[in-house]
Protein backbone atom coordinates (compact mmCIF):
# COMPACT_ATOMS: atom_id res chain seq x y z
CA UNK A 1 0.00 0.00 0.00
CA UNK A 2 1.70 3.17 -1.23
CA UNK A 3 0.80 6.51 0.34
CA UNK A 4 2.51 9.88 0.19
CA UNK A 5 2.22 13.23 1.95
CA UNK A 6 -0.80 14.02 4.09
CA UNK A 7 -3.07 11.01 4.46
CA UNK A 8 -6.30 12.87 3.75
CA UNK A 9 -6.01 15.68 1.22
CA UNK A 10 -8.48 18.47 0.54
CA UNK A 11 -9.73 19.63 -2.85
CA UNK A 12 -6.64 21.82 -3.15
CA UNK A 13 -4.67 18.69 -4.04
CA UNK A 14 -5.05 17.34 -7.57
CA UNK A 15 -7.05 14.15 -8.10
CA UNK A 16 -4.77 11.13 -8.41
CA UNK A 17 -1.75 13.16 -7.28
CA UNK A 18 0.02 10.04 -6.02
CA UNK A 19 -0.34 7.79 -9.09
CA UNK A 20 3.09 8.49 -10.59
CA UNK A 21 4.78 7.85 -7.23
CA UNK A 22 2.94 4.55 -6.87
CA UNK A 23 4.08 3.50 -10.35
CA UNK A 24 7.72 4.14 -9.43
CA UNK A 25 7.38 1.74 -6.50
CA UNK A 26 5.51 -0.86 -8.57
CA UNK A 27 8.20 -0.77 -11.26
CA UNK A 28 10.85 -1.48 -8.62
CA UNK A 29 9.27 -4.44 -6.80
CA UNK A 30 7.59 -7.75 -7.63
CA UNK A 31 4.60 -7.87 -5.28
CA UNK A 32 1.07 -6.49 -5.77
CA UNK A 33 0.78 -2.78 -5.11
CA UNK A 34 -2.22 -0.81 -3.84
CA UNK A 35 -2.40 2.88 -4.75
CA UNK A 36 -4.29 5.63 -2.97
CA UNK A 37 -4.64 9.41 -3.05
CA UNK A 38 -7.70 11.40 -4.23
CA UNK A 39 -8.72 8.75 -6.76
CA UNK A 40 -12.40 9.59 -7.04
CA UNK A 41 -13.11 9.16 -10.74
CA UNK A 42 -13.84 6.00 -12.72
CA UNK A 43 -11.66 6.99 -15.67
CA UNK A 44 -8.78 7.91 -13.37
CA UNK A 45 -9.04 4.63 -11.46
CA UNK A 46 -9.29 2.45 -14.57
CA UNK A 47 -6.43 4.24 -16.32
CA UNK A 48 -4.19 3.74 -13.28
CA UNK A 49 -4.77 -0.01 -13.53
CA UNK A 50 -4.51 -0.14 -17.32
CA UNK A 51 -1.16 1.63 -17.47
CA UNK A 52 0.10 -0.63 -14.69
CA UNK A 53 0.68 2.15 -12.20
CA UNK A 54 -0.85 -0.10 -9.55
CA UNK A 55 -2.56 -3.45 -9.16
CA UNK A 56 -5.38 -2.27 -6.91
CA UNK A 57 -6.99 1.13 -6.36
CA UNK A 58 -7.81 1.99 -2.75
CA UNK A 59 -10.97 4.08 -2.49
CA UNK A 60 -11.09 5.78 0.89
CA UNK A 61 -13.37 8.79 1.06
CA UNK A 62 -14.80 7.90 -2.35
CA UNK A 63 -16.17 4.72 -0.76
CA UNK A 64 -17.81 6.80 1.96
CA UNK A 65 -19.26 9.11 -0.67
CA UNK A 66 -20.51 6.26 -2.85
CA UNK A 67 -20.12 2.71 -1.48
CA UNK A 68 -21.46 1.36 -4.79
CA UNK A 69 -18.65 2.91 -6.87
CA UNK A 70 -17.11 -0.44 -8.03
CA UNK A 71 -20.44 -1.94 -9.07
CA UNK A 72 -21.48 1.25 -10.87
CA UNK A 73 -18.21 1.18 -12.82
CA UNK A 74 -18.71 -2.51 -13.61
CA UNK A 75 -22.29 -1.91 -14.79
CA UNK A 76 -21.48 1.20 -16.81
CA UNK A 77 -23.48 3.50 -14.52
CA UNK A 78 -20.80 6.18 -14.58
CA UNK A 79 -23.29 9.06 -14.57
CA UNK A 80 -24.77 7.74 -11.32
CA UNK A 81 -21.51 7.85 -9.35
CA UNK A 82 -21.47 10.35 -6.50
CA UNK A 83 -18.01 11.92 -6.66
CA UNK A 84 -16.07 12.80 -3.51
CA UNK A 85 -15.41 16.54 -3.62
CA UNK A 86 -12.60 16.52 -1.06
CA UNK A 87 -14.60 18.89 1.15
CA UNK A 88 -13.99 16.89 4.38
CA UNK A 89 -17.20 18.28 5.89
CA UNK A 90 -18.80 15.04 7.05
CA UNK A 91 -16.09 12.41 6.81
CA UNK A 92 -13.21 14.04 8.68
CA UNK A 93 -14.83 16.77 10.76
CA UNK A 94 -17.49 14.83 12.65
CA UNK A 95 -17.96 16.70 15.92
CA UNK A 96 -21.30 18.43 15.37
CA UNK A 97 -23.51 16.29 13.17
CA UNK A 98 -27.27 16.16 13.44
CA UNK A 99 -28.98 13.07 14.85
CA UNK A 100 -25.75 11.54 16.13
CA UNK A 101 -24.03 11.30 12.77
CA UNK A 102 -20.66 9.63 12.76
CA UNK A 103 -18.57 9.42 9.61
CA UNK A 104 -20.74 10.30 6.63
CA UNK A 105 -20.69 12.45 3.49
CA UNK A 106 -21.90 15.94 2.60
CA UNK A 107 -23.45 14.89 -0.71
CA UNK A 108 -24.59 11.45 0.46
CA UNK A 109 -26.17 11.65 3.94
CA UNK A 110 -27.25 8.01 3.57
CA UNK A 111 -23.61 7.02 4.08
CA UNK A 112 -23.27 5.74 7.63
CA UNK A 113 -27.05 5.53 8.07
CA UNK A 114 -27.83 2.74 5.60
CA UNK A 115 -29.55 0.65 8.27
CA UNK A 116 -31.61 3.59 9.53
CA UNK A 117 -32.52 5.59 6.44
CA UNK A 118 -34.18 3.46 3.76
CA UNK A 119 -36.05 4.66 0.69
CA UNK A 120 -39.31 2.72 0.62
CA UNK A 121 -42.17 2.93 -1.83
CA UNK A 122 -44.89 5.33 -0.72
CA UNK A 123 -48.24 3.81 0.25
CA UNK A 124 -49.94 6.50 -1.82
CA UNK A 125 -48.34 8.40 -4.68
CA UNK A 126 -48.59 12.18 -4.42
CA UNK A 127 -48.17 15.07 -6.81
CA UNK A 128 -45.29 17.13 -5.43
CA UNK A 129 -43.74 20.42 -6.53
CA UNK A 130 -40.21 21.42 -5.62
CA UNK A 131 -39.23 25.03 -6.15
CA UNK A 132 -35.50 25.38 -6.78
CA UNK A 133 -33.00 23.15 -8.55
CA UNK A 134 -30.11 23.52 -6.15
CA UNK A 135 -28.63 20.59 -4.21
CA UNK A 136 -31.43 20.56 -1.63
CA UNK A 137 -34.20 20.65 -4.21
CA UNK A 138 -32.67 17.98 -6.45
CA UNK A 139 -31.81 15.68 -3.54
CA UNK A 140 -35.38 15.81 -2.28
CA UNK A 141 -36.69 15.37 -5.83
CA UNK A 142 -34.94 12.13 -6.73
CA UNK A 143 -35.65 10.54 -3.34
CA UNK A 144 -39.35 11.36 -3.64
CA UNK A 145 -39.30 10.15 -7.24
CA UNK A 146 -37.77 6.85 -6.17
CA UNK A 147 -40.54 6.50 -3.59
CA UNK A 148 -43.04 6.63 -6.44
CA UNK A 149 -44.31 10.19 -6.22
CA UNK A 150 -44.98 12.40 -9.25
CA UNK A 151 -42.38 15.15 -8.80
CA UNK A 152 -41.90 18.40 -10.70
CA UNK A 153 -38.94 20.71 -10.07
CA UNK A 154 -39.24 24.36 -11.05
CA UNK A 155 -35.91 26.08 -11.70
CA UNK A 156 -35.93 29.74 -12.75
CA UNK A 157 -32.45 29.58 -14.33
CA UNK A 158 -31.41 27.78 -17.51
CA UNK A 159 -29.24 25.36 -15.51
CA UNK A 160 -29.53 23.65 -12.14
CA UNK A 161 -27.25 24.08 -9.15
CA UNK A 162 -27.96 27.49 -7.67
CA UNK A 163 -25.29 28.79 -5.29
CA UNK A 164 -23.68 25.34 -5.30
CA UNK A 165 -22.95 25.73 -9.01
CA UNK A 166 -21.15 29.01 -8.30
CA UNK A 167 -19.17 27.31 -5.53
CA UNK A 168 -17.76 24.94 -8.16
CA UNK A 169 -16.21 27.78 -10.19
CA UNK A 170 -12.81 27.84 -8.43
CA UNK A 171 -10.59 25.29 -10.22
CA UNK A 172 -9.91 23.14 -7.18
CA UNK A 173 -13.65 22.81 -6.43
CA UNK A 174 -14.87 21.76 -9.87
CA UNK A 175 -15.83 18.29 -8.61
CA UNK A 176 -18.78 20.03 -6.91
CA UNK A 177 -20.38 20.38 -10.35
CA UNK A 178 -20.47 16.58 -10.62
CA UNK A 179 -22.81 16.46 -7.62
CA UNK A 180 -25.48 18.35 -9.52
CA UNK A 181 -24.94 16.20 -12.64
CA UNK A 182 -25.41 13.03 -10.59
CA UNK A 183 -28.50 14.31 -8.80
CA UNK A 184 -29.96 15.18 -12.22
CA UNK A 185 -29.15 11.65 -13.44
CA UNK A 186 -31.05 10.28 -10.44
CA UNK A 187 -33.96 12.61 -11.22
CA UNK A 188 -34.10 11.30 -14.78
CA UNK A 189 -33.90 7.71 -13.57
CA UNK A 190 -36.84 8.19 -11.21
CA UNK A 191 -39.01 10.15 -13.66
CA UNK A 192 -38.69 13.56 -12.04
CA UNK A 193 -39.68 16.42 -14.34
CA UNK A 194 -37.35 19.44 -14.23
CA UNK A 195 -38.73 22.64 -15.75
CA UNK A 196 -35.97 25.17 -16.43
CA UNK A 197 -36.42 28.90 -16.89
CA UNK A 198 -39.74 28.61 -15.11
CA UNK A 199 -40.65 30.91 -12.24
CA UNK A 200 -43.05 29.26 -9.82
CA UNK A 201 -45.80 31.61 -8.68
CA UNK A 202 -48.65 31.17 -6.25
CA UNK A 203 -51.09 31.18 -9.16
CA UNK A 204 -49.19 28.47 -11.05
CA UNK A 205 -48.86 26.23 -8.01
CA UNK A 206 -52.50 26.62 -7.03
CA UNK A 207 -53.63 25.82 -10.57
CA UNK A 208 -51.59 22.59 -10.70
CA UNK A 209 -53.24 21.27 -7.51
CA UNK A 210 -50.12 19.81 -5.92
CA UNK A 211 -50.55 17.66 -2.83
CA UNK A 212 -47.33 19.00 -1.34
CA UNK A 213 -44.93 21.82 -2.15
CA UNK A 214 -41.28 22.02 -1.09
CA UNK A 215 -39.61 25.42 -1.26
CA UNK A 216 -35.85 25.19 -1.86
CA UNK A 217 -35.25 28.63 -3.32
CA UNK A 218 -31.86 29.12 -1.69
CA UNK A 219 -30.47 32.42 -0.52
CA UNK A 220 -29.83 35.99 -1.60
CA UNK A 221 -26.73 38.10 -0.94
CA UNK A 222 -26.88 40.46 2.03
CA UNK A 223 -26.63 44.08 0.85
CA UNK A 224 -26.17 46.38 3.87
CA UNK A 225 -27.35 49.97 3.84
CA UNK A 226 -23.90 51.49 3.51
CA UNK A 227 -23.46 54.82 1.75
CA UNK A 228 -22.07 54.22 -1.75
CA UNK A 229 -23.32 50.64 -1.99
CA UNK A 230 -25.01 51.45 -5.32
CA UNK A 231 -21.95 52.96 -6.99
CA UNK A 232 -21.37 51.81 -10.57
CA UNK A 233 -18.08 50.09 -9.70
CA UNK A 234 -19.61 47.99 -6.90
CA UNK A 235 -20.36 44.34 -7.70
CA UNK A 236 -21.69 41.29 -5.87
CA UNK A 237 -19.55 38.18 -5.34
CA UNK A 238 -22.04 36.23 -7.47
CA UNK A 239 -21.23 38.52 -10.40
CA UNK A 240 -17.62 37.37 -10.20
CA UNK A 241 -18.33 33.67 -9.64
CA UNK A 242 -20.78 33.61 -12.56
CA UNK A 243 -18.27 35.49 -14.76
CA UNK A 244 -20.75 38.28 -15.42
CA UNK A 245 -17.88 40.52 -14.39
CA UNK A 246 -14.21 39.71 -15.01
CA UNK A 247 -11.29 41.83 -13.82
CA UNK A 248 -7.80 41.75 -15.33
CA UNK A 249 -4.79 43.68 -14.07
CA UNK A 250 -6.93 45.84 -11.80
CA UNK A 251 -6.95 46.79 -8.15
CA UNK A 252 -9.96 45.20 -6.47
CA UNK A 253 -11.34 45.53 -2.93
CA UNK A 254 -13.47 42.67 -1.55
CA UNK A 255 -15.72 43.49 1.41
CA UNK A 256 -16.28 40.37 3.49
CA UNK A 257 -13.81 37.66 4.54
CA UNK A 258 -16.16 34.74 4.95
CA UNK A 259 -15.56 31.66 2.80
CA UNK A 260 -17.33 33.18 -0.22
CA UNK A 261 -15.43 36.44 0.15
CA UNK A 262 -12.01 34.84 0.41
CA UNK A 263 -12.67 32.37 -2.43
CA UNK A 264 -13.95 35.21 -4.60
CA UNK A 265 -10.81 37.18 -3.81
CA UNK A 266 -8.77 34.10 -4.69
CA UNK A 267 -10.48 33.80 -8.08
CA UNK A 268 -9.94 37.51 -8.79
CA UNK A 269 -6.30 37.19 -7.74
CA UNK A 270 -5.72 34.32 -10.16
CA UNK A 271 -6.47 36.70 -13.04
CA UNK A 272 -3.52 38.90 -12.17
CA UNK A 273 -5.39 41.47 -10.11
CA UNK A 274 -4.18 43.16 -6.95
CA UNK A 275 -6.70 42.24 -4.25
CA UNK A 276 -7.43 43.41 -0.71
CA UNK A 277 -10.08 41.85 1.55
CA UNK A 278 -11.67 43.73 4.46
CA UNK A 279 -13.84 42.33 7.26
CA UNK A 280 -14.89 43.24 10.79
CA UNK A 281 -14.20 39.66 11.92
CA UNK A 282 -10.93 38.70 13.58
CA UNK A 283 -10.52 35.55 11.47
CA UNK A 284 -10.84 34.91 7.74
CA UNK A 285 -13.19 32.13 6.54
CA UNK A 286 -13.93 31.11 10.14
CA UNK A 287 -16.59 28.52 9.26
CA UNK A 288 -14.51 26.65 6.68
CA UNK A 289 -13.26 23.14 7.57
CA UNK A 290 -9.79 23.27 9.10
CA UNK A 291 -7.65 21.80 6.33
CA UNK A 292 -9.39 23.38 3.32
CA UNK A 293 -9.27 26.70 5.19
CA UNK A 294 -5.55 26.29 5.77
CA UNK A 295 -5.01 25.47 2.08
CA UNK A 296 -7.16 28.43 1.03
CA UNK A 297 -5.29 30.94 3.17
CA UNK A 298 -1.93 29.58 2.01
CA UNK A 299 -2.98 30.00 -1.62
CA UNK A 300 -4.34 33.48 -0.98
CA UNK A 301 -1.01 34.43 0.56
CA UNK A 302 0.84 33.05 -2.48
CA UNK A 303 -1.31 35.25 -4.71
CA UNK A 304 -0.30 38.30 -2.69
CA UNK A 305 -3.82 39.00 -1.47
CA UNK A 306 -3.96 41.20 1.61
CA UNK A 307 -6.62 40.47 4.26
CA UNK A 308 -7.46 43.31 6.64
CA UNK A 309 -9.41 42.09 9.70
CA UNK A 310 -11.09 43.80 12.67
CA UNK A 311 -12.14 46.52 10.24
CA UNK A 312 -15.75 47.70 9.96
CA UNK A 313 -16.79 49.29 6.67
CA UNK A 314 -18.51 52.65 7.24
CA UNK A 315 -18.78 54.09 3.74
CA UNK A 316 -17.96 53.23 0.14
CA UNK A 317 -16.27 55.96 -1.87
CA UNK A 318 -15.68 56.18 -5.61
CA UNK A 319 -12.37 54.33 -5.36
CA UNK A 320 -12.31 52.79 -1.89
CA UNK A 321 -13.84 52.82 1.58
CA UNK A 322 -13.90 54.52 4.93
CA UNK A 323 -13.57 51.94 7.71
CA UNK A 324 -13.16 51.78 11.47
CA UNK A 325 -10.32 49.89 13.11
CA UNK A 326 -9.46 50.02 16.81
CA UNK A 327 -11.87 52.92 17.25
CA UNK A 328 -10.20 55.02 14.56
CA UNK A 329 -11.55 55.98 11.14
CA UNK A 330 -9.26 55.11 8.24
CA UNK A 331 -9.46 55.04 4.45
CA UNK A 332 -8.47 52.75 1.61
CA UNK A 333 -8.25 54.35 -1.83
CA UNK A 334 -7.06 53.71 -5.37
CA UNK A 335 -9.30 50.74 -6.22
CA UNK A 336 -10.88 50.15 -9.61
CA UNK A 337 -13.70 47.97 -8.31
CA UNK A 338 -15.35 46.88 -5.07
CA UNK A 339 -16.93 43.46 -4.54
CA UNK A 340 -19.55 42.74 -1.88
CA UNK A 341 -19.42 39.44 0.04
CA UNK A 342 -21.37 40.19 3.21
CA UNK A 343 -22.98 36.78 3.45
CA UNK A 344 -26.41 35.44 2.56
CA UNK A 345 -30.01 35.59 3.77
CA UNK A 346 -32.94 33.25 3.07
CA UNK A 347 -34.75 33.76 -0.21
CA UNK A 348 -38.12 33.05 1.40
CA UNK A 349 -40.43 35.48 -0.40
CA UNK A 350 -42.20 32.70 -2.28
CA UNK A 351 -42.61 30.61 0.87
CA UNK A 352 -44.19 33.52 2.71
CA UNK A 353 -46.53 34.02 -0.23
CA UNK A 354 -47.69 30.41 -0.61
CA UNK A 355 -47.53 28.93 2.88
CA UNK A 356 -51.28 29.39 3.26
CA UNK A 357 -51.85 26.88 0.44
CA UNK A 358 -51.21 24.10 2.95
CA UNK A 359 -48.67 21.25 3.00
CA UNK A 360 -45.87 23.66 2.13
CA UNK A 361 -42.36 22.92 3.42
CA UNK A 362 -39.15 24.91 3.27
CA UNK A 363 -35.60 23.54 3.33
CA UNK A 364 -31.99 24.60 2.91
CA UNK A 365 -30.95 28.22 2.64
CA UNK A 366 -34.56 29.24 2.01
CA UNK A 367 -35.19 28.29 5.65
CA UNK A 368 -31.92 29.52 7.13
CA UNK A 369 -28.79 30.52 5.25
CA UNK A 370 -26.13 27.90 5.85
CA UNK A 371 -24.10 25.53 3.71
CA UNK A 372 -24.59 22.61 1.34
CA UNK A 373 -24.17 19.89 3.94
CA UNK A 374 -27.02 21.34 5.98
CA UNK A 375 -29.24 21.83 2.95
CA UNK A 376 -28.70 18.32 1.55
CA UNK A 377 -29.20 16.75 4.97
CA UNK A 378 -32.49 18.61 5.51
CA UNK A 379 -33.69 17.65 2.04
CA UNK A 380 -32.92 13.98 2.63
CA UNK A 381 -34.63 13.89 6.00
CA UNK A 382 -37.77 15.61 4.69
CA UNK A 383 -38.03 13.44 1.58
CA UNK A 384 -37.83 10.24 3.60
Predicted feature descriptions by range:
Residues 122-153, 195-209, 217-230, 238-290, ...:
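Rossmann-like dinucleotide/flavin-binding elements
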Residues 5-11, 55, 165-172, 280-285, ...:
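Short beta-alpha connecting loops at secondary-structure transitions
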Residues 37, 180, 196-199, 217, ...:
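Short loop/edge segments at beta-strand edges and connector loops
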Residues 15, 45-58, 206-216, 332-337:
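Short, electropositive alpha-helical surface patch
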Residues 24, 47-48, 72, 186, ...:
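Well-formed, non-transmembrane alpha-helical positions, independent of function
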Residues 27-28, 50, 146, 189, ...:
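Residues at the C-terminal ends
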Residues 150-190, 267-311:
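Rossmann-like dinucleotide-binding cores of NAD(P)H-dependent redox enzymes
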Residues 1-131, 135, 139-146, 151, ...:
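Flavin-dependent oxidoreductase catalytic cores
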Amino acid sequence: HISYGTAIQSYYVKNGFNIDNVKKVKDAINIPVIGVGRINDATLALSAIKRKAMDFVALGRQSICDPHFPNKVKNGQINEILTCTGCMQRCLYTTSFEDGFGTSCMINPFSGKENVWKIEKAKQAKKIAIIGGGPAGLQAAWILGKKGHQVTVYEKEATAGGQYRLASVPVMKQDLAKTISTYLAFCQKYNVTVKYQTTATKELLATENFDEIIVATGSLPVIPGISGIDNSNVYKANDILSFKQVFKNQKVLVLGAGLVGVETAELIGEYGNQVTVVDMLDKAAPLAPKRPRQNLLEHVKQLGINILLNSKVLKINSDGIVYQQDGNEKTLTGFDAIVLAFGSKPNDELYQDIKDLGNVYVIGDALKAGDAKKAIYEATKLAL
